[in-house]
């Protein structure tokens, strides 16, 4: 790509893998994170910016002029804590979307969410309403007007083996997927036209990985068009608030 790619949460477990894959492709990468110490552990080719998704003013400079943004922030589970699901995967997403509109050309936005977000009775929702807030963050992305991809991984593992990847929709099944494969999906979404405007779940099984991701994305249904009314309102930086 001709412009930098920002990885928000790029010092986290998935974010670091995304960063390395982009660098391997020769991309200019801006990593946004809260820990200067962890930032020093990044490859020297990556440009680190100290930023916090809960503080909109810290996002404007690192996101300015980026051709794409990959949001890999990992939430906490305490609803009253500083890394609550609300503040990281809803408010933080909205703040990043608002900052993303600062350039002349709207960037592509890739959001790492999770499977089960439409199942409010799933046990994961007991942790600070994790699933409710993730779904609200997804909705903000879909309503933003930016070109986007929403990735919903299954249970995450650290396996390094090559895997057969399944992309699916409907949020009905279960499964596992490695962080390695999630990172690859995020990166591939930037280069595959069929990945635009889709939300999908992913899981992996023993087998060979895809040689070409475009056919996998091409089998997915695009999301219903977002309503224009109210879309811009969703782009304003926000303080935490409750979901009705």
State where each predicted segment sits.
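N-terminal Rossmann NAD(P)H-binding glycine-rich loop of SDR-like oxidoreductase domains
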Residues: 3-27
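Structural motif
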Residues: 4, 67-68, 108
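Non-catalytic, hydrophobic alpha-helical segments
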Residues: 14, 69, 141, 151, ...
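NAD(P)H-binding glycine-rich loop region in Rossmannoid oxidoreductase-like domains
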Residues: 31-101
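Glycine-/Pro-rich loop/turn segments that contact NAD(P) or position catalytic residues
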Residues: 75-174
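Substrate-positioning beta->alpha
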Residues: 93, 173-188, 198
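Glycine/proline-rich active-site loop of Rossmann-fold NAD(P)-dependent oxidoreductases
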Residues: 160-165, 189-198, 213
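C-terminal tail/cap regions
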Residues: 198-244
